[in-house]
Amino acid sequence: MTDLSRRQWLASLPVVAGAGGLLTGTVQTAEVSAQPVNLAPFGYCFNTSTIQGQKQPITKVVEIAAKAGYQGIEPWVRELDAHARSGGSLKDLGKQIADQGLSVEDAIGFFEWAVDDEATRRKGLEEAKRNMDMVLQIGGRRIAAPPFGTTDRSDLDLKRLTERYRTLLDIGQSIGVIPQLEVWGFSKTLGQLSEVALVAIGSGHPQACILPDVYHLHKGGSPFEGLQLLSGAAFHVFHVNDYPANPGRESITDAHRVYPGDGVAPLDSIFQTLRANGFRGMLSLELFNREYWKQDPLEVARTGLEKMKTAVQKSLG
C-alpha cells in the first residue's frame, strides 16, 4: 500500500459501527494529524427563537437571516402554522428561503412520540407526521424530536424509548424528514447526553442522530467531555449559545442564554472536539434572551453570527 493510499484508507475510518456511526473511532496516526486543517469546517444556521420576542412573520425572519449572512435557518413549526393560517403558501415560503440562499437545516416542533399512554402516543405520531409534512414543503430535511410530554417522568424504560424512537425514525424515513433526538437538560427523561446516545444507538436505525445544545448539556449536567466519544456523524445540527456563571445550573433557565463567547461555556473544547470528531454540519444559534428580544432583530442576528464565528475562530485558530 502506498503512503497516499494508506492515508486515504485511514481517513475513511472516522467511526466504528453503530446506529448512524454514532461512536468515534480510535485510529490516530501522525500522518492523519499532519494533514492541513480547515479552520472553518462548520456551517452557520439561525434558529428563529433568537428573535422570537420581536414577533416578526416568518417571511421577514427569512429576510433577516439572509441579510445577516447565515447559510441555514431553523424555523419553528408554530411559525409555519401561523404563515399557513394567514393564507401563505408553505411551498412559496420554501422558494423564498431557497432564493435567499438559505437551507432549512432543521425545524422545532412538539409532539408526544415518547409517552407511555398508547392513545396519546398515537396522536403524537400523527402530529409528528403533520409537522414533518410542513417541513418537507419548505424544503426541510430534519425536525427536532425532544422528549416532549415526558419531562416530569424519571421512570421511563430507555429500552422502550429506543423502540419508540425507531418508530418515529421509520415515519420520518417514509416522509423524507429525519427526527433528531434532542437533549433537553431540564427534563427528567433524555435530559443527559448519555441517555440520548443510548436511545439513538439502541434504535439500530441508520438515520438515528442527536441534536445537542450547549445550554442543555450544561443544564442537565452532561459532561462536555462526553462529546469526545461520539462521532461527528451523530450530529447534523448543533445548537450553539453560551451561559453566565450565575445563576447556577439548578436554577438557570433558557432566558439566561447569551451570545457565544459572552459566558462561561467551554466553547473552545466543544468546537475542537467537534472538528476532531468529523462534525461538518451546522452550528445553529438558539437564544431566548429577553433583552435581545427588545433590540433590533437584524442587529441581534448579525451580532449572534459574528460572535459565533469569533468563538469558532478563537477555538480553532
Language model segments and positions:
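Active-site acidic/histidine proton-transfer and metal-coordination neighborhood
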Residues: 13-23, 33-38, 60-66, 96-103, ...
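Flexible, glycine- and charge-enriched loops at secondary-structure boundaries
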Residues: 58, 83-86, 90, 121, ...
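Glycine-rich, proline-tolerant flexible connector loops at the mouths of alpha/beta enzymes
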Residues: 74-94, 148, 152
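Active-site-proximal loop/turn and secondary-structure-junction residues that shape catalytic pockets
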Residues: 50-52, 77-79, 110-111, 147-151, ...
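Catalytic-core regions built around general acid/base machinery
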Residues: 89-99, 164, 168, 226, ...
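A short acidic, helix-capping loop that chelates divalent metal ions and anchors anionic groups
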Residues: 79-81, 112-117, 151-155, 220, ...
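Histidine-acidic metal/acid-base catalytic patches
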Residues: 2-68, 190-212, 216-317
